[in-house]
Amino acid sequence: EQQCTPGQTKKEDCNNCTSGD
């Protein structure tokens, strides 16, 4: 499971992080 940095959101459906725009 990848860690999300501040400002990112967890995409639970694919278990990764994306920019929290």
UniProtKB/Swiss-Prot annotation:
Superkingdom in the source lineage: Eukaryota
Give the molecular function GO annotations: serine-type endopeptidase inhibitor activity
Q: Where is the Pacifastin domain?
A: 1-21
KW Secreted (keyword) present: yes
Q: Which residues cross the membrane?
A: none
An annotated GO cellular component: extracellular region
Q: Provide the primary localization.
A: secreted
Which portions of the sequence form the region Disordered? 1-21
- Compartment(s) where it occurs, according to its Swiss-Prot or TrEMBL record: Secreted
Tissues in which the protein is found = Expressed in hemolymph.
Keywords, alphabetical: Protease inhibitor, Secreted, Serine protease inhibitor
Q: Does the keyword Secreted apply?
A: yes
Name the family: Belongs to the protease inhibitor I19 family.
* Function statement: Probable serine protease inhibitor.
Q: What's the protein here called?
A: Serine protease inhibitor 1
